[in-house]
Amino acid sequence: MSDTPPATPVSFPEFSPVSTAQWQAQLARELKGADPASLRWTMPDGLVAEPFYHREALTALGGAPPPLPPRPAPCRNVVALTVPAGTDGRLQIEQAADALARGAGGIHFILNKEVANFALGELADRLPLATTWIGYTVLQQPDQLLERLRDISPNEPLLGFLRFAPITVPEGAELAMYRTALRRCLELARGWANFPVLAVNGAFFGNRGATLTQQVAYSLSTAATMLAYLPDEECGITVADVAANFHLDFAIGTSYFPEIARLRATRRLWATLLHAYGLPPQGAADLLIHASTSTWTQTTLDPHTNLLRHTTEAMSAVLGGADSIQVAAYDCLYQHYTEFSARLARNQPLILLEEAHLDWVADPAAGSYFLETLTDELARAAWVEFQALEAKGGMLEARNQAMEAISKVGLEKFKRIATGQDVVVGTNRFQNAQEKFDFQPKQLLRSRDFDTTRATYPSEVLRLATALHFERRANQDKQATLVLLGNAAVNEEIAAAFWHLLHPGQTSQPPMPDIASDSYSVLFSKPDEATLMYATPAQFDHLARVVQQVPVGHIFDIPSLINSDLATLLEAVRVFGFKEFLVEGHRTEEVLARLQGR
């Protein structure tokens, strides 16, 4: 418009430029003679952050590096939903539809069993696959999942990604055993430009304590292995096809600025890797980076502090240029999906994206003296580490050495947390002395699902063991009861009743629990909850004899009710192998809580 005033260059002539020498002199005065070097921050990678940075920092880099290109699409808020083994995922599909209606920008299904069981037909009926961003993590048969997706959506490309994470082989070594399946995935995904099917799972390394340098280097090595071994002339798969189908998964930790720099350094090195294989380096801008909050930094104690950790981690991901963010529930270490914690996790990125608008600026870290320097140093260190690993044969040949290096770093972190050198709020500093656990410590420590790879796990074990000691003393004053309900048919009736209550309106037959027909159905009634269990007749007979102190060989009628102190019965059901009755992966108390709206 004609009345619009001309733009005026920003200038502050009233302020004189301050040189590096002047800053150093002022710093010395503020420290009253102390060595300014004492303010340096040494990271686990060995990189050193200076007390301050000046414009000369960019001069040392040869000038300000060009900013990263804008994202091809807005950053997505992705909700992860785990489909338990033995289920078809209908419950998770319902949860996915609800999450998308409440602000989620995408869904990530983690399939814990055969992909043939997953209700893709139901998914296609509930969600338009061509326009809904959906990621899939599978433990086996990735090509079969893609074949089913291709059959359901034959003429429309998909949005999202496929991540193959087989549990039968180590991370980074799946190529040797599954090369044929991965090539088949590439063939099936042709034409799906926004659905990469080759995962570089950097989160695997990060969630085991790898330094930022190691995470970038080992991820590059995994990608280089695929670029070298997946192309196939007979199948018509070129190195460009492989490169175009990568997506990179990173776990973002709480080290705020270094995490921003790590993501920026990764894109720069990705361009270098593409160039090394004769591909346009501009393709690095199209690399999908899926960032998730780190399990390595998550804590079981004082779990609400995880909300704050996840917020800084998500901020680092957005500002560093991630294309999608997946925030875990603050309490996911000790319990399954709950609507309350799921809503908080879903809303954290929404606030960052919809209220703070952190993704409205392309590469907001560009030009920062500190972040540009840190990005450059991280990139250089990671490239050196990558080249060293490649010289040993890459991830296929030298994976054990890489994992040993990660273990060494993780052990050092364990020690620093145990001695208080590294602060973990709520775990080794500023603990909540009146904390009431939302879980049973003994049950959690014995659970196969409890993550023992986290940084705070050793410290948590000590705290929980102490809690167990006092809990057992308290339980000796509490009474509990085992009630014999009947045979396995009772459990089947209970399972059917719970299933129909959880899935109102469903007319199909509910899945029956996998329980032997001669098993007993048992109710374990405790002061604060009731748990359905099952056991063989021999197990129940042995427990009854021990608890009621019946001599071996003495004939007695199996009682229908056994009373004792809680501590004794808790130990007895464990020793004699009583199994907890689960409904779609949920404990009795969880099912009852859901039915009661808790």
Residue ranges and their predicted role:
Residues G63-P65, A101-G105, L182-L186, L220-A223, ...:
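Short, surface-exposed linear patches
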Residues P5-S16, A34-W41, L47-P66, D323, ...:
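Intrinsic disorder at enzyme termini
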Residues A73-P74, F246, A291-S294, P364-A366, ...:
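A short alpha-helix capping/helix-coil boundary motif
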Residues S2-S255, E259, V318, S324-A328, ...:
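Catalytic alpha/beta active-site cores
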Residues S2, M226, H247-Q440, K579-L582, ...:
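Active-site capping/gating regions of soluble enzymes
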Residues L31-A34, H304-E313, Q476-A480:
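Short, hydrophobic/aliphatic alpha-helical segments
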Residues A25-L27, Y53-A57, A173-L175, A223, ...:
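Short linear motifs at secondary-structure transitions and domain/linker junctions
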